[in-house]
Amino acid sequence: MRNVTLLNNVAADVQQITAEVNMDQRTEWKVYINTAGLNGRPQLYIEDNNSPSKNETPTGDWNPICNTCNDVDYFTLDDTVITIEKKDFKANWFRIRVEPTDNTAGTISVSLSYKTFP
């Protein structure tokens, strides 16, 4: 498993976009989100991009991965610890975007653990 810290105690009252992770092949992953001091319900978007993995950085559009629990494109950060996992992920690129929505305080940390398959 590879482990990457994507956000480390960043402000939850402004938009945050993580660095892109080049996964390059079929992947299983888990995202761990820790929050502290939120006074609203920020929205977390897990996004993929199918730009060629040989590119130094992705081009083209980022597409949100649907939250299958409620058929929207985001996950509401309404708890202090949240884990989201995906099996058989096939996009080349991965990133996380957090929108503050109605939140004006607190911090967010996000880490990613993933395993690739040939």
Map each language-model feature to its residues:
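Short, low-complexity N-terminal tether/leader segments at secretion or assembly junctions of large
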Residues: 66-69, 104-118
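Noncatalytic modules at the cell exterior or secretory-pathway interfaces
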Residues: 25-33, 86-107
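Short Trp-Ser/Thr-centered turn/loop motifs at beta-strand boundaries
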Residues: 11-23, 49
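Non-cytosolic beta-sandwich-type ligand-binding/adhesion modules
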Residues: 35-80
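Exposed aromatic-hydrophobic patches
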Residues: 17-21, 79-87
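Aromatic, loop-rich ligand-recognition surfaces of beta-strand-rich domains
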Residues: 19-42
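Residue-level recognition of conserved beta-strand positions in structured domain cores
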Residues: 33, 46-48, 98, 112
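Short, intrinsically disordered N-terminal pre-domain segments
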Residues: 1-14, 113-118
